[in-house]
């Protein structure tokens, strides 16, 4: 299942929330969303997940279980504020090295400042680049992580192929993303929370509900667990699996470069 489609006008289109936009239009629109929320991104995730994103991220790092080796290299994509990368570094006993890549400079600035305050900047690099065109050689990383970022990429299938390219043989892909709720009744509650409460909380916190409306809509347009797992396989990954969190509100996808 590809995220990119041919429009009635003959051009390539993709989703920006519930809107259909040209593939080249999506990234600037997404950038604008995250420029607006960069300084309050963690609060945004608390609102989006009712605080559960912290538990899900801890579970993601536990699944990765980074070893305490200085030659262990992780690429964390769409990780601007450093939330995942910091957890990886700490879990490894401050031995592993994480490269934080994001297309949004505002997010990276927040992450770099947080790293300095934590005293772990020596374990981190911050790189402004596009997930669809990674500025790294093939077979460079032991792991590739992305949390709540893949749905914002205009061409998801291209980003997954790039992930495969830069991973070493035996390297692991981990994708944490909001997903399709599979628990009866929870889906109704989550829809009500998403479309009624989240934009209102967003406006209260930041003065602007538009970024939160987009983020809610982008979750609904993202492929379900099985369709996304198929996309990961199509990119070349083996031993593909997923684990639902909180009834499917989020899911952790895993794949290996064999």
From Swiss-Prot:
Which InterPro entries does this one have? SAM-dependent_MTases_sf, UbiE/COQ5_MeTrFase, UbiE/COQ5_MeTrFase_CS
* Binding site residues for S-adenosyl-L-methionine: 81, 102, 130-131
- Under which pathway is this protein filed? Quinol/quinone metabolism; menaquinone biosynthesis; menaquinol from 1,4-dihydroxy-2-naphthoate: step 2/2; Cofactor biosynthesis; ubiquinone biosynthesis
UniProt superkingdom:
Bacteria
SUPFAM superfamilies, per the entry: S-adenosyl-L-methionine-dependent methyltransferases
NCBIfam families (alphabetical) = MenG_MenH_UbiE (TIGR01934), PRK00216.1-3 (NF001242), PRK00216.1-5 (NF001244)
Chain's role: Methyltransferase required for the conversion of demethylmenaquinol (DMKH2) to menaquinol (MKH2) and the conversion of 2-polyprenyl-6-methoxy-1,4-benzoquinol (DDMQH2) to 2-polyprenyl-3-methyl-6-methoxy-1,4-benzoquinol (DMQH2).
What is the name attached to this protein's record? Ubiquinone/menaquinone biosynthesis C-methyltransferase UbiE
The encoding gene:
ubiE
């Amino acid at each position: 299942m590809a995220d990119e489609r041919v429009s009635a006008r003959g051009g390539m289109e993709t989703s920006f929330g519930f809107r259909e936009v040209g593939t080249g239009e999506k990234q600037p629109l997404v950038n604008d969303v995250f420029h607006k929320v960069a300084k309050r991104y963690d609060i945004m995730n608390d609102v989006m997940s009712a605080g559960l994103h912290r538990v899900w991220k801890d579970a993601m790092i536990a699944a990765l279980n980074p070893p305490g080796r200085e030659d262990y290299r992780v690429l964390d994509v769409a990780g601007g504020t450093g939330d995942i990368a910091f957890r990886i570094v700490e879990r490894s006993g401050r031995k592993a090295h994480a490269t934080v890549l994001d297309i949004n400079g505002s997010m990276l600035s927040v992450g770099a400042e947080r790293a300095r305050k934590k005293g772990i900047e020596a374990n981190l690099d911050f790189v402004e680049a596009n997930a669809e065109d990674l500025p790294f050689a093939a077979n460079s990383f032991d792991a590739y992580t992305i949390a709540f970022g893949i749905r914002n990429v205009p061409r998801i299938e291209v980003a997954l192929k790039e992930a495969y390219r830069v991973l070493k043989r035996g390297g692991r892909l981990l994708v944490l993303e909001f997903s399709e709720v599979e628990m009866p009744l929870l889906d109704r509650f989550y829809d009500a929370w998403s479309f009624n409460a989240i934009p209102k909380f967003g406006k209260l916190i930041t003065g602007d509900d538009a970024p939160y409306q987009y983020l809610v809509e982008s979750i609904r347009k993202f492929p379900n667990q099985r369709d996304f797992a198929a996309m990961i396989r199509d990119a070349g990954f083996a031993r593909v699996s997923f684990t639902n969190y909180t009834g499917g509100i989020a899911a952790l996808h895993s794949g290996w470069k064999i």
